[in-house]
A protein has these predicted regions:
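Small-molecule kinase domains that catalyze NTP-dependent phosphoryl transfer to phosphate-bearing small molecules
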Residues: 68, 107-114, 121-126, 130, ...
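Hydrophobic anchor at the beta1->P-loop junction of P-loop NTPases
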Residues: 3-5
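P-loop (Walker A) phosphate-binding loop of NTP-binding proteins
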Residues: 8
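Residue-level signal for inorganic ion chemistry
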Residues: 32, 74, 103, 117, ...
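Conserved lysine of the Walker
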Residues: 13
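Hydrophobic positions on the alpha1 helix immediately C-terminal to the Walker A/P-loop
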Residues: 16
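ATP-dependent NMP and nucleoside kinases share a basic, alpha-helical "lid"
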Residues: 78-81, 85-153
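N-terminal phosphate/diphosphate-binding loop that engages ATP/GTP or pyrophosphate donors
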Residues: 22-84
Length: 221
């Protein structure tokens, strides 16, 4: 079985996907981390992120390590890719059709055998439209901004999100949403047969319980 979890930044995809994967003993694949890692690697190789063909070459040659942490070509980038700057870099990289073509193919290889919880923005709509369980997580703009401010603070090695950063993060999220929803290749969208879950004010345990119920129903003969 493959479980597809989509949604915008700050909707809770990562926490929910990791928890479900642990409970089911499935592999967890964060496809957003792959785009971020490629952006990080290309930048450190001195490649212009606006050059889609060059960045696609990085994606094609990349050796990923997604087992608990995020690695690319021998570099552990788990924390380095969780910054506001990398949010923008990943958005730039994700708009290139050539990059998406390469990474979608690699993601399909990862999920083809099943036993995977895959999260991203186009899993249920493009990568695995035939997935038996498709979830779309969302939350209010304020809730998402608070979560992302906290996450990027942790990624930068800070103890917590500063209150005055939340507004800045909210603006960045608005720009990222526009980029994700209007890009020509695999835009962020709710797949017609996906289950929409609003996580605003809802605990992780409650969301996980909803998803696990869906998984149980899909497994029934």
């Amino acid at each position: 079985m493959l479980i597809a979890i989509d949604g915008p930044s700050g909707a809770g995809k990562g926490t929910v996907a990791r928890t479900i994967a642990t409970q089911l003993k499935f592999r967890h694949v964060d496809t957003g981390a792959m785009y971020r890692a490629v952006a990080w690697r290309a930048d450190h190789l001195g490649i212009d992120l606006a050059d889609g063909l060059a960045v696609a070459g990085v994606a094609e040659r990349a050796v990923f390590d997604l087992d608990g942490r995020v690695g690319i070509d021998g570099h552990d980038v788990t924390s380095a890719i969780r910054t506001t700057a990398m949010d923008a870099a990943a958005a730039t990289v994700a708009r290139h059709p050539d990059v998406r073509r390469v990474l979608v193919a690699r993601q399909r290889d990862m999920g083809r055998a099943g036993g995977v919880v895959m999260e991203g923005r186009d899993i249920g709509s493009v990568v695995f439209p035939e997935a038996p369980v498709k979830i779309y997580l969302d939350a209010s703009p304020d809730e998402r901004a608070r979560r992302r401010a906290r996450d990027t603070s942790h990624g930068a090695g800070q103890a917590g999100a500063e209150p005055d950063r939340v507004g800045q993060v909210a603006q960045a999220l608005e720009a990222r949403d526009l980029s994700d929803r209007t890009r020509a290749a695999s835009p962020l969208m709710l797949a017609p047969d996906a289950v929409y879950i609003d996580t605003t004010g809802v605990s992780v345990d409650e969301v996980v319980a909803q998803v696990m119920d869906l998984v149980a129903n899909r497994r029934l003969p």
